[in-house]
From Swiss-Prot:
Protein name, as recorded: Eukaryotic translation initiation factor 3 subunit D-1
The UniProt record lists the keyword Cytoplasm: yes
PTM sites of type Phosphothreonine: T128
Any Gene Ontology biological process: regulation of translational initiation
Species this chain originates from: Drosophila willistoni
Amino acid sequence: MSETINTSAQFPTFEKPTVQFNEKGWGPCELPDTFKDVPYQPFSKNDRLGKICDWTNTSNNDKKYQNKYASSFGTGIQYSYYHEEDETTFHLVDTARVQKPPHQRGRFRNMRNSRSGRGRNARGGINTHGMTTLSGKNVKARDPRRGMGKKFGNRGPPPKMRESSVAVRSDWASIEEMDFPRLIKLSLPNIKEGVDIATCGTLEYYDKTYDRINVKNEKPLQKIDRIVHTVTTTDDPVIRRLSKTVGNVFATDAILATIMCSTRSNYSWDIVIEKVGDKIFMDKRDHTEFDLLTVNETSVEPPTDDDSSCNSPRNLAIEATFINHNFSQQVLKTGDQEAKFKFEESNPFISEDEDIQVASVGYRYKKWELGSDIVLVARCEHDGVLQTPSGEPQFMSIKALNEWDSKMANGVEWRQKLDTQRGAVLANELRNNACKLAKWTVQAVLAGSDQLKLGYVSRINPRDHSRHVILGTQQFKPHEFATQINLSMDNAWGILRCIIDLVMKQRDGKYLIMKDPNKPIIRLYDIPDNTFDSDDSDDGEGDDGEGFQQVYNYANNSNKI
């Protein structure tokens, strides 16, 4: 029997698939019809696959949500499927802590917290009964999409823009810009103590009973009816006389302190400089806020600019100036029967026939050699004198710090801390009024004062800015206090010398240096010679026709404060 093989059987054939060739890139050139209009859910390989797509994300054109086109990785996890374990295999476990021997208790506690970074005292977490939970700050950090509004400046109030002390005019030419980081690096060492050229005025002796004042034994601040002169450089008759024979740079201690402590200032200020030949005269503009004492200038939250409030920067400055002048006169022994210390010359700003009560101020005109044939002549001031047991007088600079509202100033309560923690009160004042305290220290060093007396004056009621009490006093040696507040006199002299050298290189004329109100920069401008001439007044001219700046009677102006 033979078998026959059928060779005509049909075998399955192989059909070659169509492969699309993309000449310009890789991947398919066109999308098949079967895959068109199929929604697609973005995903990450790190996410668990819980669904194919999300039909709830409808498109909208609401501009309120600026981050709707951001990455959507991980947004569908809340809809994911989670496999629940069988609870029949669950068993209770005894979690009671085994009591350790005394020598092993707390053995690795500090090491564990410091290494893991998740302990109670470590950064990044709070340990609560063995459970480590992230703090609120770090919880927000886990989601990179949170806080985008604050990051791009869409939330929060805009930065406060301060006004300039003087409006820059179009005909002023900017010569130089000096930023604070560069000024801080300047240094002019080995400047010797100033030499006295002339001494004027009369000083009263300090009343030591004010050293025993404390919070429980406070004393009301009185309103002293005395006149305080604030005469600028070119209106000083003594400087006019000395400029003919001595020095080539002339200024006052207030002007020098403003320049030397410029790197600590936040508010805007300006000083007019006039160059005549090889001589420079530094002046302040008349009837400005240059002589007012700032309050909380360097604070993290300075006073708000509300002119209707008694706690606005200007009203606080007037109040601080009023307190400072009254305190410096109240702590002195006044009266016709009390002894007084008289300098060689009388007060140069009053005539002999004038019957007015002038504040106790001693003027000391000194000169300094700054090198390169630069001789500085300045008028410095003393506020009082102290009689020592040896009989030698010690000259004093008397200033007052004032408390206006500790809650608004982010400070400490003076009535609670001043007697027990005076260092904390002073440290808080150094943070809030660093520039003002530095100026006072520089003025005391320039004048050669033996003591810097600081008084602590507070409001009787935080809402009443017209009545104050003295809560205590404190004294320092100026050079030691400068070291304590990290004030370098070498740097202060270097800043002054830098500005003098810049002006010396210019032609004769009038210039102005101004602190930028919003940037740590000092600018030098070349201004026309007739600038600010229209602001001068003829009030208070002396007998010789020399126009002095108007004197301020702070006691009579107390109602305006």
